[in-house]
């Protein structure tokens, strides 16, 4: 078994545990995963999200304490591969047996977000059957467009698109372009994977165009270099990168369950989606009301719902590396923060929060 990537995600998880102070009265970030569906029968989803892995192969999940089962955070599901139209209202949460995933791609992506973004709610749109490799990476654009419009009715804040298009006639992409612009008008952030065609190929669309999505490349666990399969940096798009090599994700129950290793920009994308969700969760939490009111008088915090605004924040959290690629910081706002000596935890907590809001103010006001 290849070495499991743990460095980046360990930094992210420890930062969340130490710096975010969520309460159940805080607004909840809602994320749409539009992919191959979701395997609700996987036993791990009946437990709280994984805190860490143990065992001889480091693949035995140890759940977080005092958190709800992951399945309760799946709030809606619709199969766009079937002819039945989706409802335009939020209904009851889906039952595990009612959700389908034949490939495991969507389950892996949703599982990463459930693990990395505590309390975030998910809505799942199945937009590809997952039995054909070409359809998996580039499903019917009109189907994805319909799923985006459904996600808008589900009041999501972020959409994960681990898919993309190459050499597609513009006419075929027009419905999807329109849906992406509609999502922007609804202050919904869209993240898309750039693809894994290597440095001789450009990024897939919409990741290649900053007008439609925030593009994400895969990089190594240290965040120091893009993966060998990463396509070349886009001239007109964001070139964020996050760990996408040897990530441990849920394996379909029908294939034995448990976990397996995957690599690619498809899986780096939900890592960055989780970071964006954590940024929103931090800003919205009750603990930050005073800072939110103060900073909100100086800058437009609503810009966090725009591609440009969130893009600037993600740049502020990370650093430019390896040419035009930009590594997203797994320590969130606190990469350059100097820890106190622990003698006055309450004071240090306030100072850490003040530091974070300083970073945020500078990024949004740019």
Curated annotation (Swiss-Prot):
Domain Peptidase S8 residues, every copy: 1-321
GO CC list: membrane
Record-annotated active site: 35 (charge relay system), 105 (charge relay system), 266 (charge relay system)
Amino acid composition bias (Pro residues), ranges on this chain: 83-96
GO molecular function: serine-type endopeptidase activity
Keyword Oxidoreductase: no
Gene3D superfamilies per the UniProt record, alphabetical: Peptidase S8/S53 domain
EC number assigned by the record: 3.4.21.-
Membrane topology according to the record: Single-pass membrane protein
PROSITE patterns reported for this sequence: SUBTILASE, SUBTILASE_ASP
GO BP annotations listed: proteolysis
Alphabetical list of Pfam families matching this protein: Peptidase_S8 (PF00082)
Parts of the chain that traverse the membrane: 261-283
Region (Disordered): 79-98
Subcellular location: Membrane
Enzyme class: hydrolase
Keyword Transmembrane: yes
Protein name from the UniProt record: Subtilisin-like protease het-Q2
